[in-house]
From Swiss-Prot:
PANTHER family: EXPANSIN-A15. Residues 1-27 form the signal peptide. Residues 76-186 form the Expansin-like EG45 domain. It is found in: Secreted, Cell wall; Membrane. Causes loosening and extension of plant cell walls by disrupting non-covalent bonding between cellulose microfibrils and matrix glucans. No enzymatic activity has been found. This is Putative expansin-A26. It comes from Arabidopsis thaliana. One of its GO terms (cellular component) is extracellular region. Belongs to the expansin family. Expansin A subfamily. The gene is EXPA26. It is a peripheral membrane protein. It comes from the Eukaryota. GO terms for biological process: anatomical structure morphogenesis; plant-type cell wall loosening. Residues 196-275 form the Expansin-like CBD domain.
């Protein structure tokens, strides 16, 4: 009887192991036909996890395009940057779906994107872009739910899309990863608002690219925490006109830099100031 029990037990273990091992043979990273060979992918990190800000792993998503070849319709946008050519972003931009946009906190983040697993439409190589806009969900649709949660989706400028896929594809599977942003010159601070409501757009941010905290300081006070208004516009109701201003900026990877004496005492609204240094 004991021998029979052992045989049943061993057979049961073999069944369990078979159920566990077989699905593993269908993992990510396989090349289908003559498709562009893609890197291995991992489970996407939580968008609020700063430790994953520059996670080197690749993740699955999809991509489409919007605007024309000259960047029409890609200017302005939900990150508040305005003229992307004047601000140094140019055509290397994308609008992010809700799952990636993180209520604007991802604005300024940089990604590398490649088309994968679709040999009919994919082109070799990759593009590097900055997140500058939001691709809104359309909850009335039942198909082509590109930017609806929980989809991870990049709506690229047409110029960037054509570097990785053919125009007629429309939408393609891609893999993406966060990369450090490489920017020329210092971080820029553009003033908006009025004497009782100072709003500062911060752009041209290197390193992680996206901002987690901002503080402002005039010569006679300590650091004042600013609130994110929308995109990368940060505000304070403290009256700071007539004072020279410095800024303390923390990016999502936890790096903090102080930008001393960015704005002179006679600064005005609608002006842009160079922070001189970058991440």
């Amino acid at each position: 009887m004991k021998l029979l029990e052992k045989m049943i037990y061993v057979e049961f273990l073999m069944i369990i192991m078979a159920m566990w091992v077989v699905p593993m043979s269908y993992g990510h990273g396989a090349m289908i036909g003559n498709a562009v060979e893609a890197p291995d992918v991992a489970e996407a990190p939580g968008i609020n996890d700063p430790s994953k800000a520059l996670d080197p792993n690749w993740y699955d998503a999809r991509a489409t395009f919007y605007g024309d070849i000259h960047g029409g319709d890609t200017q302005q946008g939900a990150c508040g940057y305005g003229n992307l050519f004047r601000q140094g972003y140019g055509l290397a931009t994308a609008a992010l779906s809700t799952a990636l946009f993180n209520d604007g906190y991802t604005c300024g983040a940089c990604y590398e994107i490649m088309c994968t697993r679709d040999p009919q439409w994919c082109l070799p190589g990759s593009v590097k872009i900055t997140a500058t806009n939001f691709c809104p969900a359309n909850y009335s649709k039942t198909t082509d739910l590109w930017c609806n949660p929980p989809q991870k989706h990049f709506d690229l400028s047409l110029a960037m899309f054509l570097k990785i896929a053919k125009y007629k594809a429309g939408v393609v599977p891609v893999r993406y990863r966060r990369i450090p942003c490489s920017k020329t010159g210092g971080v820029k601070f553009e003033t908006k608002g009025n004497p009782y409501f100072l709003m500062v757009l911060i752009y041209n941010v290197g390193g992680a690219g996206d901002i987690k905290y901002v503080q402002v300081k005039e010569n006679k006070t300590g650091w004042i925490t600013m609130k994110k208004n929308w995109g990368q516009n940060w505000t304070t109701s403290t009256v700071l006109t007539g004072q020279g201003l410095s800024f303390r900026v923390t990016t999502t990877d936890g790096i903090t830099k102080d930008f001393w004496n960015v704005m002179p005492k006679n600064w005005g609204f609608g002006q842009t100031f160079d922070g001189k240094i970058n991440f």
